Design a protein with these regions (language model features):
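Rossmann-like dinucleotide/flavin-binding elements
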Residues: 27-106, 217-262, 305, 326-331, ...
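Predominantly flavin-linked oxidoreductase catalytic cores and closely associated redox partners
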Residues: 171-176, 182-270, 335, 343
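Short hydrophobic core segments
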Residues: 36-38, 79-81, 104, 185-198, ...
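Glycine/serine-rich phosphate-binding loop and adjoining beta1-alpha1 elements at the start
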Residues: 12-66, 171-177, 182-211
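Glycine-rich beta-alpha-beta "Rossmann" dinucleotide-binding loop(s) and their flanking helix/strand
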Residues: 2-20, 191, 195-217, 307, ...
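Non-ligating segments of multi-cofactor redox enzymes
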Residues: 337-731, 736-763
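Active-site-adjacent segment of FAD-dependent monooxygenases/related oxidoreductases
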Residues: 104-143
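A Rossmann-like FAD-binding core segment of flavoenzymes
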Residues: 6-7, 120-126, 139-188, 247-338
């Protein structure tokens, strides 16, 4: 039972994984192994120019260290593993910085580019940033590019050992590395791993795949003429190979799904034309079972029953993507992203023991089941809480992610379990003492919660401004984060905690309102200046002044719908304090947001919360006239306060920030987000919405947009099809991060950006 529950929890926590996971990297691309850096394709650089930039940046960081250079002539300052764009540029930059560097390459120099089809044009995107480092990069045929790079290596006397792959890596006690290759053994102070992942083609692992005429890349399509060719795969590489091979051959495509869901629009058009002209035959819902001499066995799903076909096959191209070399990386000691280790139940037991110790510390322990718990001294509670909490910390630093989950829960259970219920109603084990303990310097715990909230948003907001705005020179993101921080400081901190009281004291709101107890005594209602119903759930009851009722109706049912017409759900990413904490404090974990169809199905929950909020609000408004509604209304308010206001908006989502990204509340439980979604979807279907994200035809399927979407949208699938992304088909909140991270400038708000025509000229 416990194992089954843990598997279920594990599947939820792993739902943010992309098809290809990356190594878990700290700042400056350093892995969890000190002194071991990862750059290039493995580190998320989707195009050559960005991989080159990573190579230069990591060397700038290493060279600035006081121990960057070794006094021992037998120890290299740096060994670069991989001689592609990132690795070569890093080695050249290291040499320029006076570092003694060696580059190892298991294949040929620039092996990934070397394996491109002959004559393939290599682009120097993005155009907006110049190439960094010594490597030459401009639009060119792959043969010309490799020739220029080989010339640069020779001119700079760069020590590159081709056909010499890395076999083992061991960190020594003195901090250096012992590097074992296919041919020799070396020592180095630091390692830069730039092996990429495209050199590891994914395989079917079926009989006959090792035959001479079964390939995992297409190098020279002109070598094949008037032959039967089977292409396996449904991505753009497979379709492009099939199209070029179909010019002089009979081509069949075997694909496991029922349709091609991620094709470039132009590839889709060309494929349909080729199928209509009977130059290509499609075999959907099929899997290759075996490759034989001159034929292949394919199993086809015919809607419930399996049928085996034997198709002629002089050559087969298995083009189903590349595999991340996970086992190789783990053999080096590198930890992967979102890798769950440790014991869930051990972490849960230690978290409970910590709370139990705090129960004894609070002095409110009561006897239970005949056990004299009330007699346990407070200092024993201190020892128990310190020991259990310390064990969680120690386990966390040893790589136990469940321990970090336990610590995160303890922190936010304490904050919200004390603040939200209020004095005397705190959650166990803080009942009767927690609120007072957190009320400092004459201010209640609620005030210090607001201080903590604003501080977290400010500190991490400044980091986010640098990451997305300043470093990328992106004015949209700079203004977005300035907006979030401004709303938090002004409307969610200064006004409710200071300015409202001053407005009453100095009668800035007029003498009548200042002397109205219903207005003056409810400073908490000032949150409703920006928070609309149903996010500000109590807008219309508990005896509000008329001005609050009027403003609540105007904000919720006039201003918000008009705002949504032009901006979709940007309220979540530009204004809201809940979304603000997610966009700032939660930003560093945005790539862990749940993805896939299952995670989208979970989005029904905020509709349920919206319906419940509407039902309770209606009952509260009618209870004075309908006696039967009084008890259900009271129960509904209490239930909403407990489950929505404390657990769903507070404890659970913030606990899960480091594990499921920052938008758990906004995406799955926020009733206002769902209300805006319904408005925006209706506007889109009516054809009057002004909110959408468009795509041009330059998408390279790097998946950076999908990876960084905090609400788990498969943005790349929209970009590939050049399909507008709006709220009729997605829960997009308009943060624009997908637009910012795209290396090809594919995405934009509104109409697609104009394309610059690039002509391939040959010397």
């Amino acid at each position: 039972m416990l194992r089954k529950l843990q598997r279920k929890i594990d599947s939820v926590l792993a739902s943010g994984d992309m098809p290809t996971r990356r190594p878990a990297l700290r700042g400056n691309n350093e892995s969890n192994v000190p002194g071991l850096y990862v750059i290039g394709d493995l580190a998320g650089a989707p195009v050559i120019k960005l991989a080159m930039a990573q190579g230069v940046a990591v060397i700038d960081h290493i060279a600035a260290k006081p121990d960057a250079r070794s006094a021992d002539p037998n120890v290299y300052d740096l060994i670069v593993v991989g001689a592609g764009a990132a690795g070569l540029n890093a080695a050249l930059a290291a040499q320029d910085k006076g570092l003694r560097a060696l580059a190892l390459e298991k294949g040929k120099i620039a092996n990934t580019i070397e394996n491109f089809p002959e004559g393939k044009w290599v682009y120097a995107e993005p155009d907006s940033s110049p190439p960094k480092g010594k490597l030459w990069l401009d639009g060119a045929r792959k043969e010309d590019l490799i020739g220029r790079w080989s010339q640069i290596i020779t001119e700079n006397h760069l020590d590159v050992r081709a056909e010499e792959g890395l076999k083992a890596l061991e960190r020594q006690k003195d901090g250096t590395f012992r590097v074992t290759s296919d041919k020799a053994e070396y020592r180095a102070r630091r390692i830069v791993l730039a092996t990429g992942q495209r050199g590891n083609p994914r395989k079917l692992r079926v009989p006959g795949e090792d035959r001479e005429r079964v390939y995992h890349r297409l190098y020279s399509p002109r070598h094949y003429k008037n032959e039967d060719i089977l292409v396996v795969g449904g991505g753009n590489s497979a379709i492009e190979a099939a199209l070029v091979l179909a010019e002089r051959n009979r081509v069949r495509i075997s694909y496991r799904a029922s349709e091609f869901s991620r094709l470039f629009k132009d590839n889709d058009r060309k494929l349909n034309e080729a199928v209509a002209q009977k130059r290509i035959e499609l075999i959907f819902n099929s899997n290759v079972c075996e490759f034989r001499e001159k034929e292949a066995v394919v199993e086809v799903d015919r809607g419930g029953h399996q049928e085996r076909l034997t198709v002629p096959c002089d050559h087969a191209f298995v083009l189903i993507g590349a595999e991340l070399p996970v086992q190789f990386l783990k053999s080096l000691g590198i930890r992967m992203e979102n890798e769950w280790t440790g014991s869930l139940w051990r972490a849960a037991a230690l978290a409970f023991a910590t709370l139990l110790g705090l129960w004894f510390l609070g002095g409110h322990a009561a006897n239970w089941a005949g056990l004299p718990l009330a007699e346990v001294p407070r200092f024993a509670g201190v020892l128990l809480a310190a020991a259990a909490g310390g064990a969680l910390v120690a386990l966390g630093f040893r790589g136990d992610r469940y321990a970090w989950l336990g610590l995160s829960f303890l922190a936010w259970y304490t904050v919200y379990g004390v603040k939200s219920p209020g004095a005397g109603a705190e959650f166990w084990p803080y009942r009767g003492w927690g609120f007072q303990a957190l009320s400092l310097f004459g201010r209640p715990a609620t005030f210090w919660y607001t201080v903590l909230y604003t501080t977290l948003m400010t500190v991490f907001g400044i980091q986010a401004i640098k990451r997305w705005g300043l470093d990328r020179r992106d004015k949209f993101q700079i203004w977005r984060y300035i907006s979030l921080l401004s709303f938090q400081w002004i409307f969610f901190f200064l006004i409710p905690e200071f300015l409202f009281q001053w407005a009453i004291k100095y009668q800035w709101v007029g003498e009548r309102l200042a002397n109205d107890p219903a207005f003056a005594g409810q400073a908490w209602r000032s949150y409703g200046l920006v928070y609309a119903w149903p996010l500000f759930f109590y807008a219309f009851f508990y005896d509000p002044a008329k001005i609050w009722v009027l403003w609540g109706v105007l904000l919720s049912f006039v201003i918000i719908p008009l705002f949504v017409l032009f901006h979709g759900k940007r309220y979540c990413s530009w204004i809201c304090g809940c979304g603000g904490l997610a966009e700032t404090f939660g930003d560093r974990w945005r790539h862990l947001a749940p993805k896939g169809r299952a995670s989208m199905r979970w989005e029904w929950m905020n509709l349920a919360v919206l319906i419940f909020a509407a039902a309770v609000t209606l009952a509260m408004l009618l209870r004075d006239g309908v006696a039967l509604l009084r008890q259900p209304a009271a129960w509904g308010v209490n239930a909403y306060h407990l489950y929505a206001d404390i657990w769903l908006v507070g404890i659970l989502p913030v606990t899960l920030y480091p594990f499921l990204g920052g938008k758990v509340w906004c995406r799955y439980w926020c009733p206002l987000a769902k209300l805006m979604h319904l408005f925006s979807a209706a506007y889109t279907k009516l054809g009057i919405s002004r909110f959408r994200i468009e795509a041009n035809d330059k998408c390279i399927a790097c998946s950076e947009c999908t990876r960084n979407c905090q609400v788990g949208i498969d943005v790349m699938s929209y970009a590939l099809k050049q399909q507008p992304l709006d709220n009729a088909t997605s829960s997009c909140i308009g943060c624009g991060i997908c637009v910012s991270v795209c290396p090809m400038d594919v995405l934009s708000f509104g109409p697609p950006p104009k394309l610059v025509q690039i002509s391939a000229t040959r010397n």
